[in-house]
């Protein structure tokens, strides 16, 4: 559904003409990133500036507005969605295609020499800022920070307020490690780098390190804050009114003292550290240009933070929580799919939105449930071909026995975060649909069963998931795997699996948890994706990669994959064995729980779904 952006763009261009750049007045272009001041993947409503100015509400994209043109860069997950949501004022720039120039290259080519390009320096990471700055400089143009966000000024009183919800403590029974022990590890790494301080702006890193959780961003258990870690101080920049009532006790239980400062004073404190200390200051390259520029270049260590890597490698308590939460989640998924199949077979009216609500209701009954981990992708027929589709009133479609149904969903539990996709057909799939599904499944089985050297980059494994599709000229326009937080963000770095190299990927290591999610999308017809969460565990092979160590994956998602969609002749004997073994594991894990709960209806459905092929 398109909405007019004409008035918004007119007002923004008026402000661009008056924007102050030193002694000059006026900018030729204004960049509107998706990010908030913490470079979060998802934003609270207050920070949805790119969505406000463009009408496109996908999670990834950058808007560029010049005096005459408005352009939106987004990746392959969102091409279809952007086409449907952008009005005639906008040009869609398909990021990732070889013919699409970068933002900096386009601006350098299309703006007059001497032009200024403005951006809010808090919303653009240093890593993104520098190449744009370099490309503009080559055309004698400048990228300049603009104080005061122009979109906020256009939005005015209609802009939703900044969220400021209460923070909760995460007890050791769920976090597994005290803050003091985490601090010891960070101190050692600071010492090795000859650094005095670590500046942390990523919200999930702060929440994990401090064993705290929040709800300032929907689906993401984080809270707006900054953190500075030194050898002898923990400085938390946060609205003190958000702190939990047991914050003093929380510090005692974690053997630390945390100094609380106003959220907005982070810049002042960084400048103070710069002026009073001589050693280096560690800050992630993904932090904002604003924060990074406060630190002289000669004093910066710009690397992924030690907290980011520590967080990705789960401890024993987190591992147990991940496994247990996925079992409870699997029960809810089976209850939903059993119910849904029965409703469709009866001819009952179930649409994408009511289906998503029903799934949420099943999850909400499970122990330690805290909410969803993202908006459920409940997609029937052609809606499934929109990779990150979310049902709305104007797009809501009935789930029926004539179309493929794709359901990508997840939940937050006190002891883990889930993310799972299943693709089903409640009638008779076409031969092409069955072939596409089987090739997606082959890729998932290949990826999930591979053995690889420790610390290999995720990109190296990506083609394993695509090969069966590539064999017949098919592919998918998204990554194969992302990290998953522990009662934290459903998308977590620094590792990942995709065609592109993740710049901060430290290599895959034991007890990281990532997704395994190949797919295929036939534009305007259907979508297929099969997604599990896998744990990286030691692999058993004859040799040991010259003592590097062997790793493999262990699937922890517990939900059957619809065998009706499979063309068995396309599977090897080994693949059939892998699938049957997985289904036996699902049965052995979930059937005792369903029996104990007296849920014979779901138990009967599960028994049917896990029959060997």
Swiss-Prot record:
Protein name, per record: Xaa-Pro aminopeptidase ApepP
Free-text tissue specificity from the UniProt record: Detected in gut, brain, testes and ovary.
Organism (species): Drosophila melanogaster
Enzyme Commission code(s) on record: 3.4.11.9
Protein family membership: Belongs to the peptidase M24B family.
pH-dependent activity: Optimum pH is 7.6.
CDD domains registered for this protein in UniProt: APP
Chain residues that bind substrate: 77, 388, 482, 491, 517
Binding residues annotated for Mn(2+) 1, in chain numbering: 408, 419, 531
Keyword Kinase: no
Highest taxon of the lineage: Eukaryota
Listed Pfam families: Creatinase_N, Creatinase_N_2, Peptidase_M24, Peptidase_M24_C
Record Gene3D superfamilies: Creatinase/methionine aminopeptidase superfamily, Creatinase/prolidase N-terminal domain
Lineage of the species this protein comes from: Eukaryota, Metazoa, Ecdysozoa, Arthropoda, Hexapoda
Cofactor dependency: Mn(2+)
């Amino acid at each position: 559904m398109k909405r007019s952006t004409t008035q918004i763009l007119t007002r923004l261009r008026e402000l661009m003409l008056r924007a102050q750049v030193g002694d000059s007045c006026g900018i030729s272009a204004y960049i509107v990133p998706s990010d908030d001041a913490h470079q979060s993947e998802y934003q609270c409503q207050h920070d949805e500036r790119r969505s406000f100015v463009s009408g496109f509400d996908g999670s990834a994209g950058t808007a560029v507005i010049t005096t005459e043109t408005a352009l939106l860069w987004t990746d392959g997950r969102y091409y279809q969605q952007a086409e449907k949501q952008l009005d005639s004022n906008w040009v869609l720039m398909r990021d990732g295609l070889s013919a699409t120039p970068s933002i900096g290259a386009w601006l350098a080519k299309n703006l007059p020499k001497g032009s200024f390009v403005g951006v809010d320096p808090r919303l653009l990471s240093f890593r993104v800022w520098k190449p744009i700055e370099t490309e503009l400089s080559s055309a004698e143009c400048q990228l300049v920070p603009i104080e005061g966000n122009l979109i906020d000024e256009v939005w005015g009183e209609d802009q939703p307020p900044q969220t400021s919800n209460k923070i909760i403590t995460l007890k050791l029974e769920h976090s597994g490690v005290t803050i003091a022990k985490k601090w010891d590890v960070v101190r050692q790494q600071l010492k090795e780098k000859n650094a005095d301080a670590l500046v942390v702006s990523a919200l999930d890193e702060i929440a994990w390190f401090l064993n705290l959780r929040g709800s300032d961003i929907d689906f993401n258990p984080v809270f707006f804050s900054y953190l500075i870690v030194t050898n002898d101080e923990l400085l938390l920049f946060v609205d003190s009114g958000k702190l939990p009532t047991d914050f003093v006790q929380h510090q005692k239980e974690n053997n630390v003292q945390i100094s609380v400062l106003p959220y907005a004073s982070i810049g002042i404190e960084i400048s103070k550290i710069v002026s009073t200390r001589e050693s280096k200051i560690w800050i992630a390259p993904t932090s904002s240009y604003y924060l990074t520029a406060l630190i002289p270049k000669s004093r910066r260590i710009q690397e992924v933070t030690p907290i980011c890597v520590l967080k990705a490698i789960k401890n024993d308590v987190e591992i147990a929580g991940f496994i247990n939460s996925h079992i409870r989640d699997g029960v809810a998924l089976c209850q939903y799919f059993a119910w849904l199949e029965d409703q469709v077979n009866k001819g009952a009216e179930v649409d994408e939105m009511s289906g998503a609500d029903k799934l949420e209701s099943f999850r909400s009954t499970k122990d330690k449930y805290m909410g969803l981990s993202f908006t459920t992708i409940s997609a029937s027929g052609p809606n499934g071909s929109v990779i990150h589709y979310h049902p709305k009133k104007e797009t809501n479609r009935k789930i029926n026995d004539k179309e493929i149904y794709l359901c990508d969903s997840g939940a937050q539990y006190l002891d883990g975060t889930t993310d799972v996709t299943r693709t089903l057909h409640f009638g008779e799939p076409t031969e092409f649909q069955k072939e596409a599904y089987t090739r997606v499944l082959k890729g998932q089985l290949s990826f999930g069963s591979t053995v690889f050297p420790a610390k290999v980059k995720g990109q190296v494994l990506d083609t394993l998931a695509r090969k069966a599709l590539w064999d017949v000229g098919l592919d998918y326009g998204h990554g194969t795997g992302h990290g998953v937080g522990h009662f934290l963000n459903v998308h977590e770095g620094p590792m990942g699996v995709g065609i592109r190299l993740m710049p901060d990927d430290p290599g895959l290591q034991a007890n990281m948890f990532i997704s395994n999610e190949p797919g295929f999308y036939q534009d305007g017809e259907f979508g297929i994706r099969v997604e599990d969460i896998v744990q990286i565990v030691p692999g058993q092979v004859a040799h040991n990669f010259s003592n590097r160590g062997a790793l493999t994956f262990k699937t922890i998602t517990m939900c059957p994959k619809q065998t009706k969609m499979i063309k068995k002749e396309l599977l090897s004997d080994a693949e059939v064995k892998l699938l049957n073994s997985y289904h036996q594991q699902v049965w052995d894990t979930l059937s005792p729980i369903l029996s104990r709960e007296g849920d014979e209806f779901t138990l009967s459905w599960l028994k049917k779904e896990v029959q060997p092929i």
